Amino acid sequence: MIQHTNVTGPMMVTQAFLPLLEKSDHPKVINISSGLGSCSASPRFSTTGYQCSKAALNMLTKCFADEKKNVTFVAIHPGWVQTDMGKSKNRDPPVTVSDSAKGILDVANSISDDKSGGFYSFEGKVLPY
């Protein structure tokens, strides 16, 4: 189920909208990933399915970027956000929903075409795959 939500869904939506996106001046696809989807820098939690699905979303982002040079594709980690999903027994998430959303929009609006296929934090930092 989680693979359908985090990988298959974004792939199908992207494929459906690509013909329209390719007609726009500066088309971009922004995939909301997670730092937990980094194969090289992710801490290990008991969220294997989630982590694997976000790693797959990152790969999907890279594959689309390689295939569609006229569209900018990036994956963005929204941070550890103060949401129901982000709650922890030990401490509160440090990032507010509004700060995360603003950061994602800032990155999306400022990302250049040559950065297509990249993985970024909501603060604009390059993250390792």
Regions found by a protein language model. Name each.
Residues 71, 75-83, 87-129:
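C-terminal helical subdomain
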Residues 1-12, 18-69:
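Catalytic loop of short-chain dehydrogenase/reductase
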